Swiss-Prot record:
Subunit structure: Homotrimer.
Entries under NCBIfam families matching the protein: YadA_autotrans (NF033478)
Protein name: Adhesin YadA
Disruption phenotype: Decreased binding to host cells and to host collagen I under dynamic flow conditions.
GO MF terms, alphabetically ordered: collagen binding
GO term, biological process aspect, one: cell adhesion
């Protein structure tokens, strides 16, 4: 040989090579059936390991076309510089690519495959029978697949799907469902992460112990705030209930006094008018009677006087009785109306207090981001009310609540509140 040329072959490969009639030669015309190792880039030096041509049907030659490339196995092909193809039908088409295993394919620069039927694209690594990966991906395990860039799939039949770039699937049949994710199962196969240390940074995972501690702390704070809010609400309700009751009583007393004054004034006015009318009528009749008596004084003085006196007595008595009767009827009617108004007012007060009690029984949501629906009943004396409401806790400090109460007929009471804590 005109130039130094070094070949390093593993013990297994040397044993395989020399178990058959292989030889070294400087002959450009030699054909190769199972093994071919290319010379270096100097065209004057062609050092090869070969076996005399024995063609199978369709051809079984190994082909190392790239500089410093190696092809071992029937129909193995190393097409680019420093490529290695080992195994029947293996193909290494990229620079520095390695395909080991029957029908394995390293189809890009620096791609590496190991396993029967495995496939790797540029800068990818596929280890395991039928494992496959796209550019810059890593697939380890039988039938593991990486169809997205810069992703990793480890485990039997694990899979990183198309467009799920920068994702990782770990475990038997694990599958990803989005970008930038780590999957240890799939929709119907869930796994647990065990022996997980407590997280210390914002981007660390939280274990169950940490979660329980935070839940207990949150519940404690919620109970404390709930007690404070309940106390404030009860105080407010008590003050408003007392104020409402006092206002109702005052209004009832005012209405009663007004009605009584009106009745008295009207009764006095009617009585006075009736009396004046009676007196006027009596005086008129008396004058008429007296005139008639004077005309007939000579012939019927005694009879006329008797008749006049009788008529006057009857007329005055009837007019007076009628005036008193009308006055009594009017007064009774007004007092009856007053009683009805007082009864209605009393009923409205009872319904208002029952509605207030029902609204106060509604709950406020305690969970952050939770919406609640609540219902309650209330009663006061013989009146009852039903209340419904809803609330929403925006965060730990802010909450909203609204409710409406119905006490029958058209008696409806409602409220709404906004709560902020610090």
């Amino acid at each position: 040989m005109t130039k130094d040329f070094k070949i390093s072959v593993s013990a297994a490969l040397i044993s395989a090579l020399f178990s058959s009639p292989y030889a070294f030669a400087n002959n450009d015309e030699v054909h190769f059936t199972a093994v071919q190792i290319s010379p270096n880039s100097d065209p004057d030096s062609h050092v090869m390991i070969f076996q005399p041509e024995v063609r199978a049907p369709g051809g079984t030659n190994a082909l190392a076309k790239g500089t410093h490339s190696i092809a071992v196995g029937a129909s193995a092909e190393a097409a680019e510089r420093a490529a290695v193809a080992v195994g029947a039908g293996s193909i290494a088409t990229g620079v520095n690519s390695v395909a080991i295993g029957p029908l394995s394919k390293a189809l890009g620069d620096s791609a590496v495959t190991y396993g029967a039927g495995s496939t790797a694209q540029k800068d990818g690594v596929a280890i395991g029978a039928r494992a496959s990966t796209s550019d810059t991906g890593v697939a380890v395990g039988f039938n593991s697949k990486v169809d997205a860039k810069n992703s990793v799939s480890i485990g039997h039949s694990s899979h990183v799907a198309v467009d799920h770039d920068y994702s990782i699937a770990i475990g038997d049949r694990s599958k990803t469902d989005r970008k930038n994710s780590v999957s240890i199962g799939h929709e119907s196969l869930n796994r647990q992460l065990t022996h997980l240390a407590a997280g210390t940074k914002d981007t660390d995972a939280v274990n169950v112990a940490q979660l329980k501690k935070e839940i207990e702390k949150t519940q404690e704070n919620a109970n404390k705030k709930s007690a404070e809010v309940l106390g404030i609400a009860n105080n407010y309700t008590d003050s408003k209930s007392a104020e409402t009751l006092e206002n109702a009583r005052k209004e009832a007393f005012d209405l009663s006094n007004d009605a009584l004054d009106m009745a008295k004034k009207h009764s006095n006015s009617v009585a006075r008018t009736t009396l004046e009318t009676a007196e006027e009528h009596t005086n008129k009749k008396s004058a008429e009677t007296l005139a008639s008596a004077n005309v007939y004084a000579d012939s019927k003085s005694s009879h006329t006087l008797k008749t006049a006196n009788s008529y006057t007595d009857v007329t005055v008595s009837n007019s007076t009785k009628k005036a008193i009767r009308e006055s009594n009827q009017y007064t009774d009617h007004k007092f009856h109306q007053l009683d009805n108004r007082l009864d209605k007012l009393d009923t409205r007060v009872d319904k208002g207090l029952a509605s207030s009690a029902a609204l106060n029984s509604l709950f406020q949501p305690y969970g952050v981001g939770k919406v609640n629906f609540t219902a309650g009943v209330g009663g006061y004396r013989s009146s009852q009310a039903l209340a419904i409401g809803s609330g929403y806790r925006v965060n730990e400090s802010v909450a909203l609540k609204a409710g409406v109460a119905y006490a029958g007929s058209s008696d409806v009471m409602y409220n709404a509140s906004f709560n902020i804590e610090w």
